[in-house]
């Protein structure tokens, strides 16, 4: 008895359609990463191996409140997008479970938040990233995290300019109080 199965062509056709949809999704993800790399002011890569889900969610909430977009992508897809944008030196940092933090409003915020949390959570490892359209190493990223943010720098400048004026006003007030000069 000769029995033929006509299910094989249907199965392969459905499987091929599924693979095409996976491939389309990967192309969309690479395009998304490409867009983020072009539109972000900075990128910090952090390895989160061994971190609990609660700690990771807490880190993501802190990123979100600072205006930092954090995403987990497959390293292979990120490598493709990095190559498309000319960031070939990033490939050495794309090993292991990585979280990508894109600085959209404040360029220093991703590295600063990661460095602060890495002190409390030694499992967080600040890797390289992108700052000012240049690939930076982990050591350079650590230096960037020590820089003041834009608002902190403005506050420091304002207090630096205000301090001599306060001292002059205080000195003049003392002279007036001692009646060495008249107002």
From Swiss-Prot:
Cellular component GO terms held in the UniProt record: ribonucleoprotein complex; ribosome
Pfam family, one: Ribosomal_L10
Top-level division of the source organism's lineage: Bacteria
Transmembrane domains' residue ranges: none
A GO MF label: large ribosomal subunit rRNA binding
Similarity annotation: Belongs to the universal ribosomal protein uL10 family.
HAMAP family: Ribosomal_uL10
Assembly, per entry: Part of the ribosomal stalk of the 50S ribosomal subunit. The N-terminus interacts with L11 and the large rRNA to form the base of the stalk. The C-terminus forms an elongated spine to which L12 dimers bind in a sequential fashion forming a multimeric L10(L12)X complex.
Protein name: Large ribosomal subunit protein uL10
Organism from which the protein derives: Mesomycoplasma hyopneumoniae (strain 7448) (Mycoplasma hyopneumoniae)
Organism lineage string: Bacteria, Bacillati, Mycoplasmatota, Mycoplasmoidales, Metamycoplasmataceae
Gene name for this UniProt entry: rplJ
């Amino acid at each position: 008895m000769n029995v033929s199965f006509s299910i094989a062509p249907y199965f392969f056709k459905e499987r091929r359609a599924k693979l095409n949809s996976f491939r389309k999704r990967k192309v969309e993800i690479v395009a998304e990463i490409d867009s983020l790399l072009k539109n972000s002011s900075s990128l910090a890569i952090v390895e989160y191996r061994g971190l609990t889900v609660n700690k990771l969610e807490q880190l993501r909430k802190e990123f979100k409140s600072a205006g930092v977009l954090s995403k987990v992508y497959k390293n292979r897809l990120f490598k493709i997008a990095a190559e498309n944008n000319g960031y070939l030196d990033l490939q050495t940092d794309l090993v292991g479970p990585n979280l990508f933090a894109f600085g959209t409003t404040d360029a220093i915020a991703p590295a600063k938040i990661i460095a602060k949390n890495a002190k409390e959570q030694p499992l967080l490892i600040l890797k390289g990233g992108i700052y000012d359209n240049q690939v930076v190493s982990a050591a350079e990223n650590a230096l960037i995290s020590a820089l003041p943010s834009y608002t902190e720098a403005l506050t420091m400048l304002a207090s630096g300019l205000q301090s001599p004026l306060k001292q002059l006003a205080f000195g003049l007030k003392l002279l007036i109080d001692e009646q060495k000069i008249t107002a």
